[in-house]
Amino acid sequence: MQEIIPDFLEECEFVDTSLAGDDLFAILESLEGAGEISPTAASTPKDGTTSSKELVKDQDYENSSPKRKKQRLETRKEEDEEEEDGDGEAEEDNKQDGQQKMSHVTVERNRRKQMNEHLTVLRSLMPCFYVKRGDQASIIGGVVEYISELQQVLQSLEAKKQRKTYAEVLSPRVVPSPRPSPPVLSPRKPPLSPRINHHQIHHHLLLPPISPRTPQPTSPYRAIPPQLPLIPQPPLRSYSSLASCSSLGDPPPYSPASSSSSPSVSSNHESSVINELVANSKSALADVEVKFSGANVLLKTVSHKIPGQVMKIIAALEDLALEILQVNINTVDETMLNSFTIKIGIECQLSAEELAQQIQQTFC
């Protein structure tokens, strides 16, 4: 049996002489374990020798390595160039970003500078008591309040102008003569004619008149020569003639009493005219000054800062049917100075003192 098996194995193509002396069971065990061997283990023999396929691959790699090196070098150069291009583009992008940031910063800086300049101008245009602090919110709030008050003043003036237009349309006035008439400051009572007693009449008849005119034959002030005897005349007739002459505007006869009293009368008349032209009203709250200047009236008020006081004064002037031509509002520290230019008409029935008292009541 042992001799037959080796003969059979020798005839086989896959005979292995190294296994000639082994037992059959060892051969079977080796065949059964061959299925469990991994492909990598099967490709590499146990003795560590390399297969023919691996040798061919190594030879191909050794033969083609310079080309691959060139390709690798070329690919590396291309990659380096791409990286450099990418770095250049990144640098350009960074530069552009930096320029954009700088431009944004400069634009924002210029905008803030212009805003500060505009706020400074706004603060200088309005009275200082409208702004309590110097921040932007306080300045803008004060501007809004000041503009709203000016709008109210404008609306009141427009309403007054419309009322005046309607009044002129409904009741047209007579066109005055081209000759300028003297301005009427305030209505006054006509001066009373002086009363003359009988003693003054007799005294006037004795003295010549002081008028520069030459006595006429029909003049009641005819001079009588002192050497001639006086002709007594009825006192009633002399009184009527003198009264008629005084009503016609002839100058009164000279008398010491009248000459002595004339300076006092003229001084009283001048003082009354001055009082009517200028009037002052002072109180703890405000000082009011009224001054007539031609056809206009200048009204000045000096007081502490009182919000809304200008509107009160304008309303009071409108109630008195006075036309406001100009309004000036000035402030110095905590003091407020208001000046009004007012046009008066013929229908005005107020004197300067009464107007000053009316304006003084608005401060109460």
UniProtKB/Swiss-Prot annotation:
Taxonomy, superkingdom: Eukaryota
Domain bHLH intervals: 99-150
Tissue-wise expression: Expressed in developing leaf epidermis. Reduced accumulation in the stomatal lineage ground cells (SLGCs) where BASL is polarized in the cell cortex. Observed in small cells of non-protruding hypocotyl cell files and of developing cotyledon epidermis. Restricted to meristemoids (stomatal precursor cell) in leaves epidermis, mostly in dividing cells of non-protruding cell files.
Phosphothreonine: residues carrying this PTM: T40, T44, T214
Disruption phenotype: Stomatal defects in cotyledons and hypocotyls.
Comp. bias (Acidic residues): 79-92
A cellular component annotation (GO) from this entry: nucleus
Substitution effect: S65A: Extra divisions outside the stomatal cell lineage and reduced phosphorylation by ASK7
Disordered: region residues: 35-109, 171-227
GO molecular function annotation: DNA binding; DNA-binding transcription activator activity; DNA-binding transcription factor activity; protein dimerization activity
Record field: compositional bias (Basic residues): 196-205
Helix-loop-helix motif, as annotated region: 113-150
PTM per Swiss-Prot/TrEMBL: Phosphorylated by ASK7/BIN2 and ASK3/SK12; this post-translational modification inhibits activity and limit epidermal cell proliferation. Phosphorylation by MPK3 and MPK6 leads to the inhibition of stomatal fate and to degradation. Stabilized by CDKA-1-mediated phosphorylation at Ser-186 which promotes stomatal development.
GO process annotations (BP): guard cell differentiation; regulation of DNA-templated transcription; regulation of response to osmotic stress; regulation of stomatal complex development; response to low humidity; response to osmotic stress; stomatal complex development
Biased composition, class Pro residues, residue ranges: 175-193, 209-218
Biased composition (Polar residues): 40-53
Effect of S255A: Ectopic stomata formation and increased accumulation
Summary of the function given for this chain in its UniProt record: Transcription factor acting as an integration node for stomata and brassinosteroid (BR) signaling pathways to control stomatal initiation and development. Activates transcription when in the presence of SCRM/ICE1. Functions as a dimer with SCRM or SCRM2 during stomatal initiation. Required for the initiation, the spacing and the formation of stomata, by promoting the first asymmetric cell divisions. Together with FMA and MUTE, modulates the stomata formation. Involved in the regulation of growth reduction under osmotic stress (e.g.
Protein's name according to its UniProt entry: Transcription factor SPEECHLESS
